[in-house]
Amino acid sequence: MMKVQVPMWSTAGDAELQFYREMGVEYISVMFHENDWDYESVSRLQERMAKFDLKITDAGSFSVFKNPIIHLGLDGRDEQIDRYNRFTTVMGQCKIPICSLAWQPDGAVRSYKRVGQYTRGSVSGIVDMTEIEKRELSHGRIYSEEEIWDNFKYFLDRTLPVCEKAGVKMALH
């Protein structure tokens, strides 16, 4: 069965939660701010959401899942992986079954936002490769495909056992 969900930030107020419920939504994907993913904060959010019959079905935090220190194997990588593992452990303690992961050292790269050829009148992120190719390298050099895969394997070797122990699945975005 398909479960329709909406994304929200961990700082969403009651009016937003009520709005989701009025739309008939039951399931929420929560993006946690850095200071909102300790056990007590997550539990409080779950209790507040339960008042609106809403349930967190998956969670992420940009600071731990879009982390160039991890993705590029930079100094401090192991400490950042430990943070991801703490996040995963808390989600498991709170019975949140899925943690998000995006392997994008530079995030989603866009040139600008505007109405484009295929956006049907809506504003969208536009990629202009000519403009992007003129940019300075974001991390000082080009990383090889092999380096990126090696860093991904390094990450998985250190996080999947924690996910399994916590009862949490990792969803790659």
What are these regions, as identified by a protein language model?
Residues M1-S10, L45-K51, P68-I69:
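Mobile, glycine- and charge-enriched loop segments
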Residues Y20, I28, M49, M91, ...:
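Conserved, mostly hydrophobic/aromatic
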Residues E22-E40, G60-D75:
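N-terminal substrate-binding region of glycoside hydrolase catalytic domains
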